[in-house]
Structure formats: C-alpha cells, structure tokens
Amino acid sequence: MVNSQVADKEKLDAQTNNQDSVATIVTTENNKKYTIPDSEKKIVYSTQNLDLWYGENHALQNINLDILENNVTAIIGPSGCGKSTYIKALNRMVELVPSVKTAGKILYRDQNIFDAKYSKEKLRTNVGMVFQQPNPFPKSIYDNITYGPKTHGIKNKKILDEIVEKSLRGAAIWDELKDRLHTNAYGLSGGQQQRVCIARCLAIEPDVILMDEPTSALDPISTLRVEELVQELKENYSIIMVTHNMQQAARVSDKTAFFLNGYVNEYDDTDKIFSNPADKQTEDYISGRFG
C-alpha cells in the first residue's frame, strides 16, 4: 500500500511539474483516491484518520479531509452516508449522543478539538451551526439575535442594537425586518426565519459556519436568497454545507466532498467533481443513477 501511494504521488508530481499549483493525492483505507489542489488559503479544519461509532454502528471510517478558509465546501452523498454526522463532529455536537465514540483527530486552527482541555464552549462560539429546519427561538427577532451576545456578557443596549443591525445586514434581511424587530420571529416566513437563524449565528462572530441542508425546507425563491447569501458570506467566513441538491452544490461551492458508506469517496474542486469525477461511483451519484 505504501509503495502504491508513493508511486501515485510521484506520477502525479511528474504530471504537474512546471505548473503553478501541484495537487496532493490522498489514498484512503478503502483505496479511494482524491486530490486536494494546493492553495494560498489556510486550512481551517484538518480531519485526520477520523473514525466515529454510534454504539456498534461504524458511521465514519478513516476520514481525512482538509477544509480551506473562506471557501464554501459542499458535503454530498446518499442518505446515511455520514454527511450530517461529519459536520456535527466538527463542533462536537455528536457528543450529545450518549453512545458515540471517536478515534483520530479533528484539528481546528491546528488544535485538536478532542483534547480533554479543549473548550467545547469556545469551539461552538467559533463554529456556528444552521440547521435543516428554521429554528428561531419563541422570542422577538431582536431577542433572537441578541441571545448569544447576552450569553457572552454583553449588556449595553447601544452595542446590542449595533449587533442586531450588523447581523441582520450580514444575513441580507435588515431592510425587510428593521421595522419589526420586536415582533415574534415565529410570524416570519420560512425563508425569513432561516435568515434570522443565520443572523443569530453571525451575532456571535463565528469563524466557521456549518450548514446542514439549510434550504431543504424552503421554497425556490427563499432557497435562491440563501444561496446568494452563502456566496456573500464566504468573503468573511468559512462555510461547510451538507446538501442533497446537486445543482445547489455545483452553484455555490468551491470544493465538494462526496461521502459514501461512511468514507470520503472523492474530494476535489467542485468544477472537477461535476465535470470530470475521478471515481465511477461519484459519477453515478451526481448523474442520479443512485442515491
């Protein structure tokens, strides 16, 4: 296996010699290969030999994946392949399941989040989460946005007002809601609720935003607005998004990881994944032959 990996690497280096960027080839334990083009962007997350179990169910197997900052990284794959489990591992939300066990490392900004001394609270401040179903609190729009800052000790009303406006502008919904800040968020449309949830996430100034099927419950117009917002947000945030929608992944992401049966089957630039995938199973999935 080692000799095979070395041969693959030497062959790839020869092919890319004299080019501006050189790709790194990775061979996973199940012999799936994926390439990660070198980039000037920093690595925000490096997953190394990650295995995860729910009881006896081996949900993630030997995951090795580097996520670049200020990119949108799409996680695709059929139901049950480990997509949502993976992103919930990135902020340790999987630990809410009593039977979960992990092995391997997830480095966030070069620190292993599984280290005993690593603060889960700090991690979840730096890494925000937007869920599949819009989940505003049963409070006013204003109180939804200020919940996180208040939890972190901010009490000054002027500062809170500024956070509310900045966050709602960041979620591209300030103009729609600026005159309704003290009305209940439950009275908003589904698309508006989801953008309020994104604004609530932005209010704590995260570094990374995890999105688990953020538009699956939305109508086409609301979906388009959220997709446009994702493109704007990547200027300041690193976004990792699970989606079943192949067109969405192709539209909004810079890189795509295809998960299959708990493995990373293929990972590359999104354009390459959708135009010239290296693996037959990847091609079959994105063309709709299974999934």
UniProtKB/Swiss-Prot annotation:
ATP binds at G77, P78, S79, G80, C81, G82, K83, S84. It is found in: Cell membrane. GO terms for biological process: phosphate ion transmembrane transport. Its main location: membrane. InterPro entries: AAA+_ATPase, ABC_transporter-like_ATP-bd, ABC_transporter-like_CS, P-loop_NTPase, PstB-like. It is a peripheral membrane protein. The keyword ATP-binding applies. This is Phosphate import ATP-binding protein PstB. It comes from Staphylococcus epidermidis (strain ATCC 35984 / DSM 28319 / BCRC 17069 / CCUG 31568 / BM 3577 / RP62A). The gene is pstB.
